């Protein structure tokens, strides 16, 4: 069974934590991933080679691997270079996710995707923010497309995710699996994404984002207290 068939119609849980969080320890990320898989997740999405390696030892479902890297001269940060992809693959990722937006990057997108295919033997998930960028990524060889970066780039920051219209456009115009990722905040929303044609649904913050969730609750309660 190929990777796309394994995940079709299922929930992919993004198990990540801020670098300064106690949850960012590899063994804790691995425990999150294992808990998600035990409850039915068909795959997990993991950041950094250290976390991928720990998760690989804990679960046998597909791992979408990435490495967020801050490069001073470039806005792209999700697996921006081939060297990053090499480390992600070596750690045990089954598919490599990367930023496929039109923003400036250290290496040409098509070259990066081709090298991942040819030298690492791994499929590529293109994280995009628009139909145009998705189409360009597929033309460059991307195997899957995710709506991951909608709402997080300069051209889309004015609109919070998810974008149901973008998802519908991607499903209509592209022939590769489309993963709905970003802004999915309830089971109802996840089901809606599948109903619109998403191949699978990725959920992170609403399931594993303890740090952000606590901050949101605290801010809401503080605002209410300040008004009283």
Curated annotation (Swiss-Prot):
Converts N-acetylmannosamine-6-phosphate (ManNAc-6-P) to N-acetylglucosamine-6-phosphate (GlcNAc-6-P). GO terms for biological process: carbohydrate metabolic process; N-acetylmannosamine catabolic process; N-acetylneuraminate catabolic process. Keywords: Carbohydrate metabolism, Isomerase. PANTHER family: N-ACETYLMANNOSAMINE-6-PHOSPHATE 2-EPIMERASE-RELATED (PTHR36204:SF1). Pathway: Amino-sugar metabolism; N-acetylneuraminate degradation; D-fructose 6-phosphate from N-acetylneuraminate: step 3/5. One of its GO terms (cellular component) is cytosol. The gene is nanE. The keyword Cell division does not apply. Belongs to the NanE family. Pfam families: NanE (PF04131). It is an enzyme of class 5 (isomerase). It catalyses: an N-acyl-D-glucosamine 6-phosphate = an N-acyl-D-mannosamine 6-phosphate. Its EC number is 5.1.3.9. The keyword Ribonucleoprotein does not apply. This is Putative N-acetylmannosamine-6-phosphate 2-epimerase.
């Amino acid at each position: 069974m190929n990777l796309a068939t394994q995940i079709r119609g299922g929930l992919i849980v993004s198990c990540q934590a801020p670098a300064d969080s106690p949850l960012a320890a590899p063994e804790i990320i691995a425990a999150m991933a294992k808990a998600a898989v035990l409850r039915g997740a068909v795959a997990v999405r993991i950041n950094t080679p250290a976390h991928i390696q720990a998760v690989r030892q804990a679960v046998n479902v597909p791992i979408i691997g990435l490495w967020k890297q801050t490069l001073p001269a470039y806005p792209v940060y999700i697996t921006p270079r081939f060297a990053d992809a090499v480390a992600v693959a070596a750690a045990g990722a089954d598919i490599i996710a990367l930023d496929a937006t039109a923003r400036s990057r250290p290496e040409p997108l098509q070259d990066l995707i081709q090298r991942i295919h040819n030298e690492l033997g791994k499929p590529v998930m293109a994280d995009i923010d628009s139909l145009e960028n998705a189409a360009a990524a597929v033309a460059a060889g991307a195997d899957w497309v995710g709506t991951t970066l909608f709402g997080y780039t300069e051209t889309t920051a004015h609109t919070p995710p998810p974008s149901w219209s973008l998802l519908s456009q991607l499903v209509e115009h592209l022939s590769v699996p489309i993963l709905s990722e970003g802004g999915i905040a309830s089971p109802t929303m996840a089901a809606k994404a599948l109903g619109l044609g998403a191949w699978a649904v990725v959920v992170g913050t609403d399931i594993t984002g303890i740090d952000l969730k606590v901050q949101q609750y605290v801010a809401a309660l503080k605002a209410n207290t300040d008004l009283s």
